[in-house]
UniProtKB/Swiss-Prot annotation:
Gene of this entry: gatC
Organism: Bordetella avium (strain 197N)
Pfam family, one: GatC
Catalytic activity: L-glutamyl-tRNA(Gln) + L-glutamine + ATP + H2O = L-glutaminyl-tRNA(Gln) + L-glutamate + ADP + phosphate + H(+); L-aspartyl-tRNA(Asn) + L-glutamine + ATP + H2O = L-asparaginyl-tRNA(Asn) + L-glutamate + ADP + phosphate + 2 H(+)
Record's subunit section: Heterotrimer of A, B and C subunits.
Methyltransferase in keyword set: no
Protein name in the entry: Aspartyl/glutamyl-tRNA(Asn/Gln) amidotransferase subunit C
Physiological role: Allows the formation of correctly charged Asn-tRNA(Asn) or Gln-tRNA(Gln) through the transamidation of misacylated Asp-tRNA(Asn) or Glu-tRNA(Gln) in organisms which lack either or both of asparaginyl-tRNA or glutaminyl-tRNA synthetases. The reaction takes place in the presence of glutamine and ATP through an activated phospho-Asp-tRNA(Asn) or phospho-Glu-tRNA(Gln).
Top-rank EC class of the record's enzyme: ligase
Protein family according to the UniProt entry: Belongs to the GatC family.
EC identifiers of the protein: 6.3.5.-
Length: 102
């Protein structure tokens, strides 16, 4: 599969990215290179290959570094106030951002 200029223009429009003709041409080359690599990876026979939890786990005994999914306070009240001072808009200790999705 290869992308043409129209495909790249459509992807850029969907991503709300404005590209010059030069950037569009470069993006087309890069995306086609990525798609070619994916095709090569898909062509590899992986029947009988055990899945890995970590890419190095086949060579080393690496424990999985998982943590509990729990809410924690990561910054002190002073640090939070310092960080929020950089926000153009804030409310109730949260950053306010403009709507970006229609």
């Amino acid at each position: 599969m290869a992308l043409n200029q129209q495909d790249v223009a459509r992807i850029a429009r969907l991503a709300r990215i404005e590209l010059t003709p030069e950037q569009q041409s470069r993006a087309q080359d890069e995306l086609n290179g990525i798609l070619h690599l994916i095709e090569r990876l898909q062509a590899v026979d992986t029947q009988g290959v055990e899945p890995l939890a970590h890419p190095l786990s086949a060579h080393e005994d690496i424990p999985l570094r998982l943590r509990q999914d729990a809410v924690t306070e990561t910054a002190s009240a002073e640090r939070r106030a310092e960080l929020l001072a950089n926000a153009p808009e804030q409310s109730a200790g949260l950053f306010l951002v403009p709507k970006v999705i229609e």
